[in-house]
């Protein structure tokens, strides 16, 4: 029943560049319908609101998700899920107007780090990390959930870094020696502020690596 979101690239399990299992990564609330999804649920790309139809636009099946604890005292650290996909159906690079492919490495969020993302709604945007180790409250259909150890991005030029439908976008470093290294997974926003899950715990939770350059 989820209508719109962003696939935040491709990840794999296995060793080297030839992973044994490939998955698309996004948010729980995008791929798993805010805890209501069932393993094996079909994933469409594009989503229903963008004209996606069964069976022609099916690209995979829900494989796993981290449940979001609906509580204002919870210690959620991610809103994340993965869907099993056939490698030929989903690439790991952004569209031509994006930043290309992420680097198959990660960095931890630090203050004032320049970042960018490519998402379904606002496409390519840039910003800076303006808060780390943040605690944020996010509304879900079942109630409000608290997230801890998050980071916050402010869009450049007083413009929003994200909009509705950008959830699931991979946030990467913008420029410098760490250009295109993954920093986090976008999951919520309000006005010019966007909340992001650090990428490290997500990769560890699902035992996956980023597919990229």
Each PLM stretch: what is its role?
Residues 1-155, 162-164, 172-178, 183, ...:
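Serine endopeptidase catalytic core focused on the charge-relay Asp
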């Amino acid at each position: 029943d989820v209508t719109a979101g962003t696939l935040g690239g491709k990840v794999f399990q296995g060793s080297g560049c030839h992973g044994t299992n490939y998955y698309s990564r996004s948010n729980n609330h995008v791929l798993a319908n805010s805890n209501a999804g069932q393993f094996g649920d079909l994933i469409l790309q594009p989503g229903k609101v963008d004209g996606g139809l069964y069976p022609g636009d099916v690209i995979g099946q829900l494989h796993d998700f981290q449940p979001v604890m609906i509580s204002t005292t919870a210690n959620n650290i991610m809103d994340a899920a993965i869907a099993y996909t056939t490698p030929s159906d989903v690439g790991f690079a952004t569209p031509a107007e994006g930043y290309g492919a992420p680097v198959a490495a990660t960095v931890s969020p630090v203050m004032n780090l320049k970042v960018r993302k490519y998402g379904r709604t606002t496409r390519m945007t840039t910003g800076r990390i303006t808060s780390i180790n943040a605690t944020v409250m996010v509304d879900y259909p079942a109630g409000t959930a608290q997230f801890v150890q998050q980071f916050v991005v402010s869009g450049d030029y007083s413009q929003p870094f994200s909009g509705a439908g950008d959830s699931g976008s991979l946030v990467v470093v913008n420029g410098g020696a760490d250009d295109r290294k993954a920093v986090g997974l976008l999951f919520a926003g309000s006005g010019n502020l966007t909340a992001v899950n650090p990428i490290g715990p997500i990769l560890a939770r699902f035992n996956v690596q980023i597919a990229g350059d």
